[in-house]
Amino acid sequence: MNPLSKLLNQQIRYNGPMSISQFMEICLLHPKYGYYTNSSPFGQKGDFVTAPEVSQMFGELIGLFLAQAWSDQKNLEEAVLVELGPGRGTLTADIMRVTKSIKNFPKKIYLLEVSAKLKLLQKSNLEGYQVEWIKNLNQIPPGPIILIANEFFDSLPINQYLKGADGWHERLIGIKNGELAFGISEQKLNIQSTEYFTHAVKGDIVEVRPSVEPIITEISNKISQWGGISLIIDYGCWDLKGNTFQAIKSHKYINPLEKPGEVDLTAHVDFSSLARSVLNCSISKLTDQGVLLERLGISERANILSRSLKADDLENHIAAHRRLTHPNEMGTLFKVMAILPKLSRMPLGL
């Protein structure tokens, strides 16, 4: 039992079972034992690889996509670039590099990051740029935003609800035989009737992210008032159903209750939930990541880059292209959705 397991065990014995969202927040963000406090999760030597770390092509194409979408709005106000959960800063660095000669593209960057360790990596990778770190979106000054959220929403804590014979119960984390274990609340819950809960049958699990609505509402408020675009890329689907709570360690899935603080905890993103929180803006169709990248010309870009590569470098380059776009890899699992001002021209590719 590691130190955070002991702490959680003590807290549950004292306060009773905790929600999955409480468990996720403690495991990921505990100031001493949290995953993002102590780990270096990204890359082959970490626990997972995000699309920007797979190949520079991802950030280059996304950067040009955002620049074109912003240009189409013909907005003369000065915009800022915002990234939520920027990891090592690789995506923002690639975006800024590929757009450096585009006059009306933002020069000021705001990064929403809670990990002090990751902030240091971002500072190193974005040296020379105008970067400011924020704790919430309210710290962004008035004006248009070009916002990117790549694998951000999947890491936000979820709550789970189980449909029983007598109604809805919350799925909780307690202790069984001295170990962390899943259970359900004794009392049934008075759940508001929504599409999620109305059509469920006995045994169904519904996941809810409490923090999604305020974040998406704030983003859409800024875009509706000032202009800009938000591009959300994550793994998930429309009208998500079932239990998707998962833990990743060294690129493998393990029991989410094992090794708390040492594993990445996530759940799939329900894009319909994100869309319902959008106010006074347009949203794009949900598009597969692979489809978007192919429409943006990743195969052509891959061919150009391959001309100077040989042996292992060429093999790795081909594998990266496949990983980003192939239906059996990231191409279909990851989805893309954009938020834009009402009546805006839908960006090419979506």
Which role fits each region the language model picked out?
Residues 116, 153, 237:
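Short, glycine/acidic-enriched loop or turn micro-motifs at the edges of active sites
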Residues 192-350:
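Long, Lys/Arg- and hydrophobic-enriched amphipathic alpha-helices
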Residues 146-197, 245-256:
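A mobile, often basic/glycine-rich helix-loop segment
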Residues 28-33, 188, 234-238:
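Short glycine-enriched loops at secondary-structure junctions
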Residues 1-84, 88-136, 140-144, 161, ...:
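Rossmann-like AdoMet
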Residues 135, 142-165, 206-210, 214, ...:
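A short SAM/SAH-binding and catalytic strip from SAM-dependent methyltransferases
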Residues 58, 147, 234:
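Conserved RecA-like P-loop NTPase ATPase core
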Residues 119, 156-157, 240:
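Conserved protein kinase catalytic core
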